[in-house]
Amino acid sequence: MVVLNPMTLGIYLQLFFCSIVSQPTFINSVVPISAALPGLDQKKRGSHKACCLLMPPPPPLFPPPFFRGSRSPLLSPDMKNLLELEASPSPCIQGSLGSPGPPGPQGPPGLPGKTGPKGEKGDLGRPGRKGRPGPPGVPGMPGPVGWPGPEGPRGEKGDLGMMGLPGSRGPMGSKGFPGSRGEKGSRGERGDLGPKGEKGFPGFPGMLGQKGEMGPKGESGLAGHRGPTGRPGKRGKQGQKGDSGIMGPPGKPGPSGQPGRQGPPGPPGPPSAGQLVMGLKGERGFPGPPGRCLCGPPVNVNNPSYGDSMYGRGSPRVPAIFVVNNQEELERLNTQNAIAFRRDQRSLYFKDSLGWLPIQLTPFYPVGYTVKQPGTCGDGVLQPGEECDDGNPDVSDGCIDCHRAYCGDGYRHQGVEDCDGSDFGYLTCETYLPGSYGDLRCTQYCSIDSTPCRYFT
C-alpha cells in the first residue's frame, strides 16, 4: 500500500474539489440548487466577457514541510503533476448562443497570460500549526553578571558532611583588631642542644672604638696556634737600693810599654759631666789686623732683607734647627748647612761638607741641675750614689743619667713604653691611625691614648 505524504494528500484533495465544482450536473443531481441560485449557463449567457468560472483553490490543510536537503523521490513526480495542472488554464471556446450542451473534452493548455495587477492585501489567515522545533543553535556569549539577588532566609543546619580536600590558599585578608592578651601558658620542655655551628668568615676590620667594660668570662675554647711574642710589659716600680758589695783587691800593675807614634787627632769626645773650673787669666795677646765694619740695619725674620746675608747673596744660610735623640737620628738627616741639637748630649752639631761636627762642647743643663764630678757617671763603673751606669749617653734605654728609667721621667723607654710625657717617638695621629688627624695623648701609664684623633668626614 502506497502511503502518501501529507502535502501530496492536500494537493489531491484540492484537485478533487475543483473537479466536482466544474461538473454542475453532478452537483444538481446531488444538491438541487438551481431554484435558489442561477445556473452556470445563465451566467454564461448574461456575461459574454466571462469565459470560464474559475474558483481559487482552498488553502492547503497542512503546511508544506521545510526541506534542508534534496527533495524526496516520492514527492518529485507529484510536484511535477501539480505544476502542470496549475500552469494549464482551462480554455473557453466561443460559440453561438444556444442550449447548453454537454461539457466538451479538456482542450490543450494555452499560453500563460500577462501578469495582472497586484491585488489588495487579504485578511489575516488563521495561524498555522506549531512547527517542529529546530535544531539547537550555537550557544551565545555569556551575558553580563547581574546584580546579586536579595539574601534569602537562613535555612536549617544540614547534616555534617564528609571532610573535603583542603582548598587553595586564599588572598591575605585585612589586618584585624588586636585581640585581648591571653593567659600565660605553661613553661615548655627544654629542647635538645643543637649542633655547634661552623666558624664564620672573619669580617672587615672596623674603626677603633672606645674601650668597653670587661665582660663575663667565656667558655674555654680550643687551644690555638702559638702567636707571636708580645712586647714587654710596663716597667715595674722602683725597688729598694741593695747593699753595696765588697770592693775587690786591686790588680797588679803591668809593665810599661814602649811609646807609640802620635796618631791623627780623633773626633771630639762626649762632653764631660764634671763641673768646669775657671782657670787663671792669661796674658794679653798681640793686637790683630784692622777689620772691616759690618754695620747695617738690624736683621730679623720679619725684615724684608732677611734673605740677603750681610756677607752677600752667595753666603750659605741655615734652613732650620733639628732636634734628635741620639747619633742614629743625627746620621739620618741629610740636610746641608743644618744645625741639630742632640738631646742625649745636650749639644749642638753643624753639618757641612765634612759631616756633622760639634759646635758646642759644653752641654746645656737646666737650672738647679747638679753636675756630677768627672769620672763618675758614664764611665761604665757602678759607684756609690749611682743606680746604674751603662757607659752610654742614650736616653732611650733603661739607664738615664745613672738612674733607672721609669714612667714619667720624660724619656720614652724604647720597647717598654709607648710614650712618656710628650715623647711619642715618630708616632702621630697620621701614622698611628692612618686617615686621621689631631694630637696623641700619653696616659699616666705611659700608653698612647688615640681618643683626640679624628677622622675626615
From Swiss-Prot:
Residues 129-132, 234-237 are annotated as: Heparan sulfate proteoglycan binding. Residues 95-154, 158-271 form the Collagen-like domain. Pfam families: Collagen. Residues 1-29 form the signal peptide. The triple-helical tail is stabilized by disulfide bonds at each end. Residues 117-126, 181-199 have a biased composition (Basic and acidic residues). The proline-rich attachment domain (PRAD) binds the AChE catalytic subunits. Anchors the catalytic subunits of asymmetric AChE to the synaptic basal lamina. This is Acetylcholinesterase collagenic tail peptide. It comes from Mus musculus. The lineage of its organism: Eukaryota, Metazoa, Chordata, Craniata, Vertebrata.
